[in-house]
């Protein structure tokens, strides 16, 4: 089994992630950085056509949620858009966690491409909103070596395609 698995949340697993992340971040930082996103996730536990879903990037080794992922599939099911990846506050120290963050994003891309439930979707895109995100996307692009897939930039989008 892979270290990471992209799985649906249920109320229990989302509540557990919320409790653990709040303990790591502290109450004030959690309220500022994550509270609104967890409230959104509670309303997006099931996949509805044309709407986004909250998914759990579950660390199977440590038995924890390392990131919350927002994905939406196009109405035709040909492409998924990776809208957000919210890493756990345990990765806030970007200077010491950069390799871990690149691994998180790589695992998210791989899992979205190969996970059942996204119809015939075989293309995933992520937008580099700022210079830091573009730097992470460039790192992922340079390290990408998963067979039968292709990673390429389309402007500020990093696009992954399963052949």
Task: Briefly describe each language-model feature range.
Residues 1-96, 115-125, 129, 138-163:
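Non-catalytic substrate-recognition and accessory regions of acyl/acetyltransferase enzymes
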Residues 133-134:
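Short, well-ordered alpha-helical microsegments
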Residues 94-114:
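Conserved acetyl-CoA-binding loop-helix of GNAT-fold acetyltransferases
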